[in-house]
């Protein structure tokens, strides 16, 4: 399944945030969206997920206009991890992750074996199986972040939309999230669009990078083509060095002035 934004313009009231944005993620492809604060990244995720209707342009899910699809079909197709944790605080971790199975269930009161299996797998993969019976309200921000990701994985959607999936996570769990998403893309052939702040993570995990600034796409291509000092410095307005890791061959990024 693919997802595509076609000349999207969007905003809030009279405040325009996105202007003529086009991008796409195909089956088996991870697209990272980078850009400074206020670039429109989270607004883009809201439009792609159907939470915000565009003022102009269309979002296509496998070639079909998202605005014309039933909510149930969208829920089965799109898994979303928003920027701010939206987990329900009155529930346990297991109950929240089970909510990811709702699009596949005829009744929330009827849990099937495949639902239990999907939830157990998501809990294990997100390293929160030991928290399954804990109340979400008792968890740290990083733990709640992993609950939100586990819910999206349990959903088994064909498209993942992630807004800063590694926010609030320590280094180990941030790497684990990258590995998990990469595995979903490669093993299940899903399409993924992920907003990232970590330039190094985009270089390591993504197939393509979209650079967003001022509500417009400034660059779109493989990491080695987009993660160039001249492009990044113009967008982020800080000194940036890019080098190639000798072992992996991947670019890595150093930001800010270096001094001894």
List the model feature ranges, each with a label.
Residues 98, 113-131, 156:
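Conserved ABC ATPase "signature" region
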């Amino acid at each position: 399944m693919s997802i595509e934004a076609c000349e999207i313009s969007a905003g809030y009231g009279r405040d325009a945030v996105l202007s003529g944005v086009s991008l796409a993620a195909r089956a088996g492809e991870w697209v990272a969206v980078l850009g400074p604060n206020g670039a429109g990244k989270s607004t883009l995720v809201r439009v792609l997920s159907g939470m915000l209707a565009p003022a102009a342009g269309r979002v296509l899910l496998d070639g079909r206009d998202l605005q014309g699809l039933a909510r149930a079909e969208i829920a089965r197709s799109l898994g979303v991890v928003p920027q701010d944790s939206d987990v329900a605080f009155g529930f346990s971790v297991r109950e929240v992750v089970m909510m990811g199975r709702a699009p596949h269930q005829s009744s929330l009161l009827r849990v099937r074996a495949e639902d239990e299996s999907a939830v157990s797998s998501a809990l294990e993969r997100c390293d929160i199986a030991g928290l399954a019976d804990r109340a979400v309200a008792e968890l740290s921000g990083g733990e709640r972040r992993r609950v939100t990701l586990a819910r999206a994985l349990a959903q088994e959607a064909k498209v993942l939309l992630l807004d800063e999936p590694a926010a609030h996570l320590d280094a180990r769990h941030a790497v684990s999230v990258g590995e998990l998403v990469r595995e979903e893309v490669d093993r299940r052939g899903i399409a993924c669009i992920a907003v990232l702040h970590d330039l190094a993570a985009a270089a390591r995990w993504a197939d393509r990078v979209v650079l967003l600034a001022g509500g417009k796409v400034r660059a779109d291509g493989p990491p080695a083509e987009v993660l160039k000092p001249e492009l990044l410095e113009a967008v982020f307005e800080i000194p940036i060095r890019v080098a190639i890791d000798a072992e992996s061959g991947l670019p890595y990024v150093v930001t800010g002035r270096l001094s001894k």
